[in-house]
């Protein structure tokens, strides 16, 4: 999205000063926003896949929230502290294609440090904005709960996760393919125009 200064600036999720904005994060996201804006007309299929992913995440969110409510508050080693997490390229493509708010910083932390978005009440980020690795993660305790509920429950949940993962790959492939195709056919990329 273009700001008042004419530069492409993605909508950043409200920070309220809790998590520091990093210049590199902002520059990287502005570059992605600019690239996608230039090619937006050719990205209809990728945007449609991103919308399917959003619907899948919206369906998955209450299921995962119910699972987390049974396990996370009792966990002696929360995954938000023990695991290294990051927002990957597909996460960013998804957010940018749908013009969803971008988290104020990368989610990475040093091993043993808590995720910068962890609060006393769980994740500060809205479910759609969270890294996919967080959305789809099922810890061993949660797997045990699912297995106690029976194979159909576990299979249905894992099937939803696998379906979203396949769509994430398809979305990325579609973006790369469309941008490559447009670059090959654009007049500015031809040898005759570079002289």
Regions picked out by a protein language model, each given a short descriptive name:
Residues 1-194:
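Short loop/turn segments that flank or connect secondary-structure elements
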């Amino acid at each position: 999205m273009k700001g008042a200064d004419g530069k492409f600036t993605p909508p950043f999720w409200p920070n309220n000063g809790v998590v520091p904005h990093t210049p590199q994060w902002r520059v990287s996201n502005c570059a992605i926003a600019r690239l996608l804006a230039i090619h937006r007309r050719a990205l209809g299929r990728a945007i449609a896949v991103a919308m399917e992913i959003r619907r899948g995440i919206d369906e998955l969110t209450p299921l995962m929230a119910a699972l987390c409510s049974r396990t996370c508050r009792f966990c002696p080693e929360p995954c938000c502290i023990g695991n290294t997490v990051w927002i990957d390229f597909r996460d960013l493509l998804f957010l940018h294609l749908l013009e969803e708010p971008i988290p104020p910083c990368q989610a990475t932390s040093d091993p043993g440090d808590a995720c910068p978005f962890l609060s006393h009440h769980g994740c500060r980020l809205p479910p759609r904005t969270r890294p996919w690795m967080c959305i789809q993660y099922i810890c061993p305790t949660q797997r045990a709960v699912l297995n106690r509920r029976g194979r159909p429950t576990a299979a249905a949940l894992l099937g939803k996760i696998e379906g979203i993962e396949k769509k994430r790959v398809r979305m990325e492939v579609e973006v790369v393919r469309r941008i490559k195709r447009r670059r090959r056919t654009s007049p500015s990329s031809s040898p005759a125009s570079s002289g």
